[in-house]
Amino acid sequence: MQKKTLSISCNPFPASRKIYQQSLLFSDVRVPLREISLTDGSNEKPLKVYDTSGPYTDKDTIIDFTKGLPAISLPWLSKRADTESYSARSVKPEDNGLAYDTKTVPAFKQKRPILRAKNGKAITQMAYARAGIITAEMEYVAIRENEGLEIKNQQKAQSDETCNGSIPEIYTAEFVRNEIACGRAIIPKNINHPECEPMIIGRNFRVKINANIGNSAVTSSMAEEIDKMVWAIHWGADTVMDLSTGRNIHNIREWILRNSPVPIGTVPLYQALEKVQGIAENLTWDIFRDTLIEQAEQGVDYFTIHAGLRLPFIPLTANRVTGIVSRGGSIMAKWCLHHHTESFLYEHFNEICDIARTYDISLSLGDGLRPGSIADANDEAQFAELKTLGELTKIAWAKDVQVMIEGPGHIPMHKIKENMEQQLDLCHEAPFYTLGPLTTDIAPGYDHITSAIGAAMIGWFGTAMLCYVTPKEHLGLPDKNDVKTGVITYKIAAHAADLAKGLPRAQLRDNALSRARFDFRWHDQFNLSLDPETACAFHDETMPKEAHKLVHFCSMCGPKFCSMRISHDIREAAAINKPKGDGIGCQV
């Protein structure tokens, strides 16, 4: 792979190659997968797995960050003929935090058409789904979720699938369409992010994970943030949120979007606050609306909107141990108290939905009153906001806008299930997207672990997407190594949840690795793992020679105490001494 402009490279995983599965419904839909080859003589077929890394791990692709990735969905939009190009708003100095001259990140120079829905047209995936239309995006995600499983009759509708929460043996585009029409799943993909490979978020599909990146007023740069994005998707992040709060927000986001094959989410309130020099009281609806349109035209796929934090709910937090811990929530609470009025996000929610509908932006309804400590878990403030999010969901659905619901937070294990049950009931089964939750507050530096415990549980109970937590949570801005640790930790949690849910094909990789382990196929063990580099490095710390990867033991047990080696001996002895006949009664 050729590198230009930025020193960023993600080579393919060892013994892996990028393959593409062609749709039988759409000639211009090719879905990427990763194929893991196993040792010759193992009698194991190559294993196909879900792949989020985009073109960055395709050895036949030349990456030029100054040009961005291929616009794979423009042909689909063109065929539907329900969008139009127009002149976008001009970039203003305040869009980049009033950054000028040498302090300004250079603008992304490659121009592209800015699209919006034609007047009166509903161009969201939910609108198509409700109209009974199967889109290329729906077909794409069905193929992805099947992880290479061939479907002989793609057009066969699953007429018995209704809104009953069942997981099918085989995903079809019709099943995907039905889930989106019900509001139980979303495909977050702005029409202005044609580089994005469609993916689906819903509890009847693979549990997805999100990785947060973003610069701050203190640290980080455009190159670092693109590097983090590419690194996060290499290790398995399904979406990325750009939570930048410093200068150059607009330009950094443009570079990220043009080079991202996964959906990008934002919290528009952060940029709006930068436009008023960080003074929450000076925020206005007009400034926020302008920010929404700015980001919509760039191609942001989903917005976190803290419209559920209402003025009457703020006093409910007075006796909390940690008060309001959401950045967006605290900003809006401060604004509401200063102006003694209802949140402008709540008051103008219909208009927010109109903007989202125009570009097919999904709304992630933010939990501004999530608990920031286990002492505050499941309190009145949290569930009052959750009920409001359910009311807002119906407003969005009435306009065919896709919605997911954000959730906590800090929740001890015995209170996690109630969160899922309340969300399904109050929010009408819209996808749940949770931060962890963290199950204890005593482990700064290890909160990727405290939260992964809760994440695995709530994913099992029905959460559709998990927002990763890194070791730096509560302590500082994550670096590249923290991003990798957070992503892999959450891939483990999500996969554990998929196994518990009984997701089709979820256990195939586990079984393949277990067989490799029992057969002492060390290279296959490494290559089937989530992090082959670390697995191999740990093995090689004590047994570094290539010949050591052929022996039937590791340094943990040695040759005499290896239980699996002894199991092989037992099986061999049993085969040799097996009596003739059925072994019952005497032979005549």
From Swiss-Prot:
The keyword Iron applies. It holds the Pfam family ThiC-associated. Keywords: 4Fe-4S, Iron, Iron-sulfur, Lyase, Metal-binding, S-adenosyl-L-methionine, Thiamine biosynthesis, Zinc. Its cofactor is [4Fe-4S] cluster. GO terms for molecular function: 4 iron, 4 sulfur cluster binding; carbon-carbon lyase activity; zinc ion binding. InterPro entries: ThiC (IPR037509), ThiC-associated_dom (IPR025747), ThiC/Bza_core_dom (IPR038521), ThiC/BzaA/B (IPR002817). Its EC number is 4.1.99.17. One of its GO terms (cellular component) is cytosol. Pathway: Cofactor biosynthesis; thiamine diphosphate biosynthesis. Catalyzes the synthesis of the hydroxymethylpyrimidine phosphate (HMP-P) moiety of thiamine from aminoimidazole ribotide (AIR) in a radical S-adenosyl-L-methionine (SAM)-dependent reaction. Homodimer. This is Phosphomethylpyrimidine synthase.
